[in-house]
Amino acid sequence: MTTMSTTATDTAAPTGRRQARPLALTYAGLDLKRQLRDRMGMFFTVALPAFLFFVFGIGDDEAYGSANVAMYVMVSMAAYGAVTATTTVAGAAATEQTMGWGRQVALTPLPSLAFVAIKTAVAMIVAALPIALIYAIGAATGSSGNAFDWLASAAIVWLGSAVFAVYGLAVCLVFKGENAAGIASGLIVIMSFLGNLFTPMDGIILEIGRFTPLYGYAGLARYPISEGYLPNDAGHDPVWLLLANVCAWTVIFAALAVWGLRRRRERV
């Protein structure tokens, strides 16, 4: 009897994994299509950052570091679009879990880790869209820099946006209901101003901004161009300061996400 039950367990596990693989691919494809068909979401994630680049950066060929001002603005707007994308997708995933979709997923052979991996992959794919569009517009309209500037800044913008997937998850786990995603996106706009993404800051506002979540990420994305020097002779940010900002906020967001998840589980 023991041998039969052990054999059944051993054969069930591989079968479950085999079922989970095509299910994971199917779910990932469906989720990506759903994100791309969300016209309002795509507007704020892709079209709005591109429009802001048209307004603030196109055609400004004044030299800035190893590039020009147009490229500096291009990187900033791509960063804004990327973090908006990862925040939106991750926030939606957290909301789905709290609204009961998590129970439906739990009934399928799809493991929790696979669900998280799918949502992360979809978030990063969506984040690549505003980066690709804005960089293409920049290349066609006079943004100039060397090959390293283009490749390094794009890579940092894309990879660094993953931090804000954790942020979106944290906010939507801490706050209740469908409005949580709106709160997360609204805070991104405020943090973008303080993070020197929309307009160069100076004085006390700049000093406050150095401690906000987007400051380190944006500074690192523009570091290949600026080497840490700020516009309007507002000072210099060493790379260790920018890295410390990103690491500190990553830990804070992760801690908030864990706390929010535990609190919700305790209420169930």
Short names for language-model regions:
Residues 112, 116-182, 189, 239-243, ...:
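Alpha-helical transmembrane segments and their short interhelical loops
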Residues 2-6, 22-26, 197-235, 239-240:
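Short hydrophobic, aromatic-rich alpha-helical segments embedded in or entering the lipid bilayer
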Residues 84-89, 162-169, 194-201, 219-225:
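Juxtamembrane membrane-interface segments at transmembrane alpha-helix termini
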Residues 104-112:
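Short helix-to-coil transition segments within interhelical loops
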